[in-house]
């Protein structure tokens, strides 16, 4: 009996201590968790926290009005009465930008290390450079459902809870569950569902946070430096700690130390002290008068302000941020409560009684009547409270920041803003998302529809959480991007930009990012088809970063139309006696392209003839009873002859297929693949197949022109003409990429279009390049059907690996293919089948009209780097809103100091996003990707002397513009009479740079 009495007194004392907010923990209203996404407050309120990423599309005046209408219309009914409220918290913190950039890059930085690529300097340069242009920001919407919502059921629910508590020991300082009201849960779920729907129809990107994520964000708001990204609170469902640390007023009956510690104790990890009516100090020891103005990393001074008088005009949230420099931290809370008119009832009564005595009260009464009219006309009046904090590591900077904050808030719609003059701790904690349902700010009432523009809903939303590329918005919001990720179902990208608009830089960034796949143990397949050397810098960067045994995986080759570069499109997979369906489709497209006259449409049945020839030619040269396999001839290939001699194999009388099988069974896979080049058909052999196969002659011997030329005649003539025109086509393969994974083929000498004949030549070389880089992209079980059993295990392993390996085809200067349908058809096939093969397809050209309707229709990413007068056509082609169209018209200005601006429209699993962003790359990246002759020469020489990473660091430091071109002009002019410099200026510059570096 006495023990129970003592316990009761202890509990009473503990409760009384909470009546006065002297303890920091008393400012936390959160008690515990109810389920995966719902927290419970100390009064039984239920709380859910949303991360608001922003608007999916660029928002201007027209789009803001639409969001205003949709969002407010959804919430009107529920806010007519008291009980539900939402809090918006927006945080901008410049001190967190570097850690945030690292967090976003981290999985891909680790992937580079896992792949043994030495690129730490490049990733670090991204962080350091972007930190100059970006700022950390986050936004949350907190849904509160208060017990007043269940006023009728509340008494019964409280009785049930009290009954459950009977006989339970006290648990001081721990989380409890006796305040959970069952009747409120359904109401809260309906409220959360309503909010989710309002966000969706308003095209706002969001995430409903799990309770552990929500509490982590609370703690980060209080102490970001002391909170790991992996930190998690202990909540019901977790194993409780077996602590023996005594609690205030604890007795031997108290079990609080054996349960989950209160959320407030888990969030408040540092001491907090009031230092002035508007300022608190978090962390650190008491500074002296002489040290309080000095920066201290373990101390944060926080000043609180609130809106004293409501704004005279509603102004968008963007206007507040536009007036605030990125280096000034901000945490602002906008609390909206339902039942605004109910809260005005007392004011209305008082105003009615005092109307005669005071003229001002007539104005109050008239204002209330106007608000009633608002509700009568379909809107809802809500109660709004707005307060904010800023901070610094010393009092001098804090004073400057809070003065700026006051001015900015006052100009946001013309309002009066005051520094907190009562409880600055409450001023701060009330801006922590979900921490408290109250605000120290003076509340005002307003129509809900008028408040929506003031909310931080319409910031540009990112799409990816993480990425090897970090783009940014114009005002510094971080925008990660990762090609080929699970955010999309297919990865078909169109990039268009006039020369000088930054296309090459963007493509190099994208292709670089594609190399890194978290968890991957091998380099993905990336094939780049280009006109010119713009991607050679990327290949050299990767080659320099790779260890010696991996350098062969990265290849840049300038393709030539000579026998030395022979590529036989009739090659098959090792041991395969026929092409797979994907390879067969490519061959059909290739032969149709040859058969079609320059500038003309394909003849009817061209594809059928090509298909028939392909079937018959492999059948004819097969090593079957009815086939005519090619006989082995000594001295055709020295490596094959040496391998046969090594194993004492007499190949006389053997056919090439037998040689292939024999070498394969001996484990000589590479030599077997070389031997197979002599077993497969050649292009010129298609002529005899078409002319002597009875079934083909019967079908395709009818005249197709006034000259009485048949389709077979045309086919034979076209083959002969193209064989003469392209020595690269009609010989056993000599150009072999081996095990290369990232390949750039430069078609500058062979792939330029213009006239119909040039377009056709370009198309053939593009198709040939597509074949050589993609021949291992599309492997599946169909390969086993065309291969003898001895190859099945080998191919099954390749198939399994190919299906899980990411692949990417990037075709630049796409306009050079003209209107050649065969290559367009191949590209569309690749795009449509991309998901099946884990394949990304990127097409880049100068104007959007270079892409036909089919490619535009199935594209899932559009990068628009220039538009100008074509902006209306681009708007229509890609369904852009009016604000985005105006950006395309006038704000895509090409490379500048802050990077390359572009409009990025992307189709994802959660909808279409269209954003205006910047590709801002560091001097280190610019030097890595540069392909001008001067830059390549100086980079190569410095790399030879000091290594790639050190060379990049020196060049980025000495020439931060990313090129030596301007410096070289000045240097040569200054030393125009110096014979040593004139004979080899690069050598002189490199020697000076090396000497300076070694002296450091």
Could you say what each language-model-derived stretch is?
Residues 3-23, 219-355, 423-453, 498-500, ...:
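C-terminal regions of RecA-like/P-loop NTPase motor modules
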Residues 413-488, 503, 511-513:
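Phosphate-binding P-loop/Walker A region and its immediate neighborhood
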Residues 60-64, 69-77, 464-556:
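Glycine-rich phosphate-binding loop of nucleotide-binding enzymes
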Residues 1-426, 430-435:
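Extended, folded cores of ATP/NTP-driven motor/assembly subunits in large transport
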Residues 345, 477, 484-501, 506-511, ...:
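Conserved P-loop NTPase motor cores
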Residues 621-744, 748-751, 759-775, 895-1000:
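Conserved P-loop NTPase motor module
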Residues 55-56, 90-102, 108, 517-624:
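Switch/coupling segment of Walker-type NTPase motor domains
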Residues 84, 523-525, 739-742, 804-808, ...:
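Loop/turn-to-beta-strand initiation segments
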């Amino acid at each position: 009996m006495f023990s129970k009495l003592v316990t009761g007194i202890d509990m009473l004392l503990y409760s009384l201590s909470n009546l006065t907010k002297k303890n920091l923990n008393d400012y936390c209203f959160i008690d515990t968790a109810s389920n995966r996404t719902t927290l419970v407050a100390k009064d039984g309120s239920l709380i859910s926290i949303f991360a608001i990423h922003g608007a999916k599309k660029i928002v201007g005046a027209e789009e803001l009005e639409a969001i205003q209408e949709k969002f407010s219309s959804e919430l009107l009914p529920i806010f007519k009465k008291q009980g539900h409220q939402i809090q918006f918290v927006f945080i901008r913190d410049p001190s967190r930008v570097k850690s945030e950039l690292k967090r976003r890059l981290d999985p891909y930085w680790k992937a580079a290390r896992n792949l043994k690529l030495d690129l730490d300097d490049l990733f670090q340069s991204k962080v350091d450079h972007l930190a100059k242009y970006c700022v950390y920001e986050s936004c949350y919407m907190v849904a509160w459902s208060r017990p007043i919502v269940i006023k009728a059921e509340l008494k019964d629910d409280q009785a049930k809870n009290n009954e459950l508590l009977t006989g339970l020991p006290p648990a001081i300082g721990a989380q409890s569950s006796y305040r959970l009201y069952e009747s409120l849960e359904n109401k809260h779920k309906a409220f959360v569902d309503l909010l989710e729907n309002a966000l969706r129809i308003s095209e706002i990107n969001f995430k409903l946070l799990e309770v552990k994520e929500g509490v982590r964000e609370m703690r980060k708001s209080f102490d970001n430096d002391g909170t790991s990204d992996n930190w998690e609170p202990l909540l019901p469902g977790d194993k409780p700690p077996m602590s023996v640390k005594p609690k205030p007023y604890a007795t031997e009956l108290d079990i609080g130390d054996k349960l989950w510690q209160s959320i407030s104790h888990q969030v408040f990890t540092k001491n907090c002290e009031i230092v002035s009516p508007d300022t608190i100090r978090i962390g650190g020891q008491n500074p002296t008068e002489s040290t309080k103005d000095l920066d201290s990393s373990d101390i944060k001074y926080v000043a609180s302000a609130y809106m004293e008088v409501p704004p005279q005009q509603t102004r968008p949230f963007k206007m507040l941020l536009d007036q605030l420099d990125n280096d000034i931290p901000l945490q602002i809370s906008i609390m909206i409560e339902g039942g605004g008119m109910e809260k005005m009832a007392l004011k209305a009564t008082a105003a009615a009684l005092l109307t005669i005595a005071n003229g001002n009260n007539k104005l109050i009464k008239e204002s209330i009547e106007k608000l009633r009219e608002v509700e009568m006309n379909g809107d809802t009046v809500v109660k709004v409270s707005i307060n904010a904090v800023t901070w610094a590591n010393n009092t001098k900077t804090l004073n400057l920041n809070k003065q700026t904050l006051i001015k900015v808030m006052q100009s946001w719609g013309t309002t009066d803003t005051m520094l907190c003059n009562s409880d600055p701790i409450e001023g701060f904690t009330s801006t922590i998302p979900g921490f408290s349902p109250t605000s120290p700010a003076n509340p005002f009432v307003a129509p809900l529809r008028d408040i929506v523009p003031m909310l931080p809903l319409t910031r540009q939303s990112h799409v990816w959480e993480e990425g090897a590329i970090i783009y940014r918005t114009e005002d510094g919001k971080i925008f990660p991007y990762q090609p080929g990720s699970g955010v999309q179902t297919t990865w078909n990208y169109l990039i268009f930009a006039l020369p000088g608009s930054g296309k090459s830089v963007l493509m190099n960034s994208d292709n670089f990012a594609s190399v890194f796949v978290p968890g991957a143990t091998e380099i993905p397949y990336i094939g780049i088809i280009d006109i010119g050397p713009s991607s050679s810098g990327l290949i050299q960067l990767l080659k320099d970063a790779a260890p010696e045994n991996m350098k062969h995986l990265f290849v840049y080759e300038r393709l030539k139309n000579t026998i030395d570069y022979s590529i036989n499109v009739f090659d098959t997979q090792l041991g395969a006696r026929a092409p797979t369906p994907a390879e067969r489709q490519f061959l059909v497209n290739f032969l149709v392209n040859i058969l079609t006259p320059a500038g003309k449409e394909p003849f009817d049945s061209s594809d059928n003839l090509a298909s028939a020839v392909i079937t018959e030619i492999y059948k004819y040269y097969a090593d079957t009873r009815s086939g005519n396999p090619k006989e082995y001839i000594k001295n055709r290939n020295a490596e094959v002859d040496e391998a046969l001699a090594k194993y004492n194999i007499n190949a006389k009388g053997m056919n090439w297929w037998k040689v292939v099988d024999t070498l394969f069974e001996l484990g000589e896979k590479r030599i077997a693949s070389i031997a197979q080049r002599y077993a497969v058909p050649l292009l010129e052999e298609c002529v005899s197949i078409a002319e002597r196969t009875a079934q083909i002659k019967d079908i395709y011997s009818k005249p197709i022109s006034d000259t009485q030329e048949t389709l077979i005649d045309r086919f034979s003539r076209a083959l002969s003409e193209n064989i003469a025109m392209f020595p690269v086509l009609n010989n056993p393969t000599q150009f072999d990429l081996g095990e290369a994974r990232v390949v750039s083929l430069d078609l500058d000498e062979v792939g330029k279009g213009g006239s119909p004949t040039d377009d056709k030549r370009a198309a053939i070389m593009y198709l040939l390049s597509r074949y050589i880089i993609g021949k291992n992209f599309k492997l599946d079980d169909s390969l086993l059907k065309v291969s003898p059993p001895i190859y099945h295990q080998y191919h099954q392993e390749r198939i399994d690996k190919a299906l899980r390996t990411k692949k990417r085809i990037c075709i630049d200067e796409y306009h050079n293919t003209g209107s050649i349908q065969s290559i367009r058809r191949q590209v569309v096939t690749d795009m449509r089948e991309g998901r099946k093969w884990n394949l990304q397809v990127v097409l880049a050209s100068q104007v959007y009209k270079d892409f036909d309707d089919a490619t535009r229709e199935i594209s899932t990413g559009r990068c628009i780097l220039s538009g100008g007068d074509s902006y209306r056509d681009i708007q229509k082609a890609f369904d852009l809103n009016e604000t985005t169209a105006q950006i395309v018209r006038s704000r895509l200005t090409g490379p500048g100091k802050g990077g390359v601006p572009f409009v990025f429209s992307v189709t994802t699993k959660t909808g279409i996003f269209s954003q205006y962003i910047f590709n801002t790359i560091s001097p280190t990246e610019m030097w890595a990707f540069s392909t001008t002759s001067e830059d390549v020469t100086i980079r190569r020489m410095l790399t030879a002397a000091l290594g790639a990473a050190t060379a990049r660091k020196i060049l980025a430091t000495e020439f931060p513009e990313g090129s030596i071109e301007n410096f070289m002009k000045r240097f040569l002019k200054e030393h125009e009479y110096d014979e040593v410099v004139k004979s080899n200026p690069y050598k002189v510059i490199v020697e000076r740079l090396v000497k300076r570096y070694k002296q450091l």
